[in-house]
Amino acid sequence: ASGGYSAGAGTTFLNFVHYDTRNPDQGLRPHTDYGLITILDITAPGLQIKVNNKFEEVPVLPGHLAIHFGEALNFITTHSDRTVGAIEHLVLSQKSTDPVRHGIVYFANPDLGGVLWQFDAQGRGKGSSSVADLFALLEKNLTEHR
């Protein structure tokens, strides 16, 4: 066992992203996703992930998806034999001369009223946090590092 989650069904949503080149400053600063997992269909360059302390471009490969693990999954696997780290990433701003960028993003997040549990590889409980408390801490850290 690596960890667990208890509460309602959580939230999942599908986001159709459109980065309009008429607003060339659109982009996303470095961040990690709060939830469990994010699945992305990347159709144009611009997504970068942090590898060895440096941001690198994620290649656009037709028919392939990118998967980001989030902070909730990182939290529940912290004491396991195989910790799943949250992926720090960013989306570059576009220039007005770039083609319009589209993407499809699926987010799977725990219910804010739920509890995340941590277990070690032998199944012993190691800790827990309410999802709301964990997300509040992550938001505080993100705000302080702007």
Whereabouts are the PLM-identified features?
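Conserved double-stranded beta-helix
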Residues: A1-Q48
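Catalytic core of Fe(II)/2-oxoglutarate
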Residues: I42-L137, T143
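Short, charged low-complexity intrinsically disordered segments located at boundaries
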Residues: T12-V17, N23, D98-V100, L134-L138
